[in-house]
Amino acid sequence: MAELLLGVNIDHIATLRNARGTAYPDPVQAAFIAEQAGADGITVHLREDRRHITDRDVRILRQTLDTRMNLEMAVTEEMLAIAVETKPHFCCLVPEKRQEVTTEGGQDVAGQRDKMRDACKRLADAGIQVSLFIDADEEQIKAAAEVGAPFIEIHTGCYADAKTDAEQAQELARIAKAATFAASLGLKVNAGHGLTYHNVKAIAAIPEMHELNIGHAIIGRAVMTGLKDAVAEMKRLMLEARG
C-alpha cells in the first residue's frame, strides 16, 4: 500500500484576494498555515489568464515552502518556460480552456503523444517530476507511461459529481481499476478534483493512491470554521477603540 499524502491547493485564497485587488488574503501565508497543519505539499494552478495565482505567487512560494510545490499548468511554451525557470518539485500538466470555471476533464495524452513526450522530457531535464492529469481510462494511462511521465493524477470529477449512489460506486470502481492498472505499469498514482470531506475516504482507501490534491473543499471549510474567531476579533478591536 502506497504512503498517502495530502497536497493542498491554495488557488482560491488567491481568488478571494483578486476579487478586490488587495494584497490579502495572501496565498503564501495560507501555504505556511497548511504546511503547519500537516499538508505534505502545496498545489497551485498558474492559468494562462492569471485568474487567481500569479507569477509572483509562484516565485515566492517556490522560495519559501518547507514542503513540496506542485505547479499545475497547461502545456504551452510560456508555461514550460516558467516551470523550467522556477523549478517546482512537481508539474502537473492539465488541459485548459479559458471559458471554463475549473478544469473540466483529463488531458488527452493518447491524442498528442509527441507534444506530451517533449514536455515531459523538457521538464525532467530541468529536474522536475511530471504528473499528467488524466481520466480513469486505460488508453490514457498507457499513453502516460509511454511518454515518460512518472506520475499520473486521476481526474475524480465524475466521481465527485455523481448524482446517485450507484453512479458514484461505478465511478469509484473505475478509478480503483485505473489505479491498479497504472501501478502495474510502474506509474505512481495521484488523484484530485471535486474531493470533499464527504467523498474523500473511498478514494483515500484505494491502496495505490499516493497523493490527493484537494483545494476548494478545504478553503470552503476554512471560511466556516474560522468565521467565528474572525468576527469576534473584529468586534473586540472595535470595542477596544472605545475604551
Swiss-Prot record:
It catalyses: 3-amino-2-oxopropyl phosphate + 1-deoxy-D-xylulose 5-phosphate = pyridoxine 5'-phosphate + phosphate + 2 H2O + H(+). GO terms for biological process: pyridoxine biosynthetic process. Its EC number is 2.6.99.2. The keyword Nucleus does not apply. 1-deoxy-D-xylulose 5-phosphate binds at D11, H12, R47, H52, T102. Catalyzes the complicated ring closure reaction between the two acyclic compounds 1-deoxy-D-xylulose-5-phosphate (DXP) and 3-amino-2-oxopropyl phosphate (1-amino-acetone-3-phosphate or AAP) to form pyridoxine 5'-phosphate (PNP) and inorganic phosphate. This is Pyridoxine 5'-phosphate synthase.
